[in-house]
Amino acid sequence: MGYRHIDTAHVYGNEKGVGKAIRKSGIPRDQIFLTSKIWHNECGEGITSKAIDRMLKRLKLDYVDLLLIHWPVGDYVGAWKDMEKAVQEGKLKSIGLSNFHGKYLEDILKIAKIMPVVDQVEYHPYVPCDDLRKELDKINCYIEAWSPIGRGNKELLNEPIFLELGKKYNKTVPQIILRWHIEKGNIVFPKSSNPVHIKENFEIFDFSLTKEEIEKIDRLKSKLIFTADFEEKLKFIASRNVSLED
């Protein structure tokens, strides 16, 4: 049992360890899908190219499967241009975005020669991002859901619809929520260090939710707003830098 899609980032500080684990795993490189992300002070035409080279050096790998711009802060348009060049050079297999929507997404789409393949955003039954999905569908861009189970929020996990469906399908509430994501066409990143929960996260492909059940879950969307004011969040992100030396 184990994951073959690994999601890391420069700001997480674990790229060296991730690269080492991949090399020691004995698993062929083409059977592992590796995503990393660049931080705002690595964004800019000419700057991002160097950041990509440093990333590959930290990982000690020849390429990553997917590189994302972590947040819409800094010169992300210039970063995108460098990322497109890196695709042509074989350093990146694909490129995408993280936490982009509205005008920030439009900025990229206006200049993109290579369209983003994913946008990684907070997404769960209380934050379903319906408008964003409509925009991404136009360019065949997938949603990757971080915090897919709503950060373990007790109110969400005790919603009657989930308890009811859990009994019906003999599944846990997180399994019901993850199955909802799959039915919606989302790529999910359920975070857990518990072997039991990791195993449970895989056991969601032996049942399906009905259209009516999916619609009931969809109607939960306006109950809570998890994410702090987005512009304030971006100001906080802008106050943090990663090293440009390693």
Summary of predicted features, one role per range:
Residues 1, 27-30, 59-62, 90, ...:
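Structured loop/turn residues at beta-strand edges in well-structured enzyme cores
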Residues 1-32, 149, 244-246:
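N-terminal binding-site loop/beta-alpha segment at the start of enzyme catalytic domains
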Residues 6, 64, 95:
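Glycine-centered flexible beta-alpha turn that most often forms the glycine-rich phosphate-binding loop
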Residues 16-23, 52-56, 83, 105:
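Short, well-ordered amphipathic alpha-helices
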Residues 29-42, 65-72, 99:
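A short, structured active-site edge motif that brings together acidic residues
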Residues 44-59, 78, 103-106, 127-128:
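Short, acidic/polar
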Residues 48-68, 85-89:
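CE4/NodB-like, metal-dependent polysaccharide N-deacetylase domain
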Residues 71-246:
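Beta/alpha (TIM)-barrel catalytic core signal, keyed to glycine-rich beta->alpha loops juxtaposed to Asp/Glu
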